[in-house]
């Protein structure tokens, strides 16, 4: 009982010192939620978009599509040539990445603070004007297969870390039993 009390007090003390993050939340007419948070300690801006779609939305026997589309949406848009996404980001002093989980797919770009409009434009391009063609499908299919080989198939404990060895047993009927990577 004494250990429980000390543990509880420890976690209570952590919560007392936790900082609340100030943000503004807007819901646009199209249903898009926009969260704004200003933090002036670094001269950078991050534009991120989270889509509420992930591996849980797939069907048994056909997994990995959310992750695959995460990759495809870097292939180019109506106004961004194929293969130029990363060039635009890096030539403007930025970095970017994306990831997929059971519940969502997340993209972000971090730029110097004077490039907010560029980040917003790039994410709007990804959302409104993606180009998905056979070249991109073939390219990203190989990229995703290589990612699976590196992270799961050929990595010690990879199947444990990425859940492919455990999740089907933990979540017998729940959508989380499906592999994210495919």
Placement of each model-derived feature along the sequence:
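Sec-dependent N-terminal signal peptides
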Residues: 3-16
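Active-site-proximal flexible loops/turns
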Residues: 9, 74, 154
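Acidic/histidine-enriched segments that form metal/cofactor-coordinating
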Residues: 51, 77-78, 84-182
